Amino acid sequence: MAYNHRMSQQFRGSQQHHGRGRKKEDENDALMRLPDKEIAGCINDIGIPFTAADLIKPNPQQIQMVFEWFAELLMNITHEAVEPAMRAAADDVGGDFPDIVPTDTRNLMGFFVSLRKLMMECGVNDFTFTDLTKPTHDRLVKIFSYLINFVRFRESQTPVIDEHFNKSEKTKARIDTLYAENQEMEQRLEEMRRNLRANEAQVKEKVRRNDELKARLLELRRNQERVAETLERVKADKTRRQTQLEEKTEKVVRTRQEVEKLRPYAMESPVSLQASLTELSENLLREKAQIDAMEKRARALQTSSDTFTVVSNDVQACVKLLEDISVELQKEEDEESRASRNKEAISERGNSVREVEQTEKLLQRQLARWNERIETLRKNAQEKAEAAQARMEELREVQKQLREERAEKQRDMERRRIRIEQTEKKMVDLKENIESEIQSAHDEYLRLESHIKLYITEMEKCI
């Protein structure tokens, strides 16, 4: 009786220890768990009729509908969304036998894969396919609690998320706008550079032509000056020659007049006439020679005059060409002024481009600062997530330790139970041995008693 009482105490102690371990394990999810009525009310708020009785005795189709609503709300995924991919996968796997797996089961399996990702994000790491097909009250309370808390957390952080999202969208839109403006400015700058290069080539060509025309103009001016000097010199020589010719002609006329006057006197003396004739012949020859020379000189002067006329015409053509060149030079000056204005406009555009580049750099720096702030917020969120993960890991370690302690205690209990069973067996054997020894001792006692009685009887007979 005492032994059985001790065994019952040990059994009650193991049950209490097992209950404490289970209680510590459940305390890990105590902060996340919600009452049944609150869960049913939240599901009713989303438009799905649901009661606490439905949670206690769950219907798989109803539970799948609730899960589908949460998946559509948080991930925009439904049965219809996964159907094309699952049908294509079934065609690839099944080949000529696509109906091996029913369509509903196939879509439910694909929906389960997407839903498991959502559960992992919500903190439910042990979500299984059985939770969809054969849900239980305890599992549904845990899963719905995590889901509802996740949705509440998301709704509570919606302004912050929207604010950062709107800021990032505005920054992105501003970047796109600045990038488009930058591209437009670069195109305009490239077009201006092309125009500048084309204008520079034209300006260089015009400058080269201008230099050539200036050199030719200077040469023509020098030639004109030389021709003008030659013309003046020839005109002066012509005037002088004409004067000399007139003088010679006048002398010849006077000489002839004198000859006519002296002719009567020459008839008086043959010798004197002969002498006079000889003298006159000589004078005549000299005069003829001079006249021939004068005629030659006149012809030369006429030739020079014709040459001067041709040269004068050439000079007039050169003057006209110079006028054309001056007009071209004026046009060149206009082109140069226009090119200078274009250069000024290009420099102004370059200044505008530099201002745009400075604005772009400023916006890039602002973008970098916003990115740094976003990165800081992301790091803070990551640090918080890491802290939560670390806390979760600590809780998991504690849970693991508790499980190990529980397993160790269970093993210890098992060893003690085995020892107790062995001790009980030994005690039973010992009891049996004692009882057999008592029985044998009793038999021996009876035998000795019978022997003693027999001996006493024989002693009495002998007496």
Swiss-Prot record:
User: Which terms are listed as keywords in the entry?
Assistant: Cell cycle, Cell division, Centromere, Chromosome, Coiled coil, Kinetochore, Mitosis, Nucleus
Q: Where are the transmembrane segments?
A: none
Query: Which biological process terms from the Gene Ontology are attached to this UniProt entry?
Result: attachment of mitotic spindle microtubules to kinetochore; cell division; kinetochore organization; meiotic chromosome segregation; mitotic spindle organization
Q: Which residues form a coiled coil?
A: 166-455
Cite the record's Polar residues compositional bias ranges. Answer: 1-14
Which InterPro entries is this protein grouped with? Kinetochore_Nuf2_N (IPR005549), Nuf2_DHR10-like (IPR041112), Nuf2_N_sf (IPR038275)
Q: Which GO terms describe its cellular component?
A: Ndc80 complex; nucleus
Q: Which domain of life is it from?
A: Eukaryota
Region: Disordered, residue numbers: 1-29, 330-357
Q: Which Gene3D superfamilies match?
A: Ncd80 complex, Nuf2 subunit
Which cell locations does it reside in? Nucleus; Chromosome, Centromere, Kinetochore
Keyword Cell inner membrane recorded: no
- Basic and acidic residues compositional bias, start-end: 337-357
GO MF term (any one): microtubule binding
Assembly information from the UniProt record:
Component of the NDC80 complex, which consists of ndc80, nuf2, spc24 and spc25.
Q: Which protein family is named in the record?
A: Belongs to the NUF2 family.
Q: Function of this protein?
A: Acts as a component of the essential kinetochore-associated NDC80 complex, which is required for chromosome segregation and spindle checkpoint activity.
Kindly provide the name given to this protein in its UniProt entry: Probable kinetochore protein nuf2
Task: Write down the species.
Answer: Aspergillus oryzae (strain ATCC 42149 / RIB 40) (Yellow koji mold)
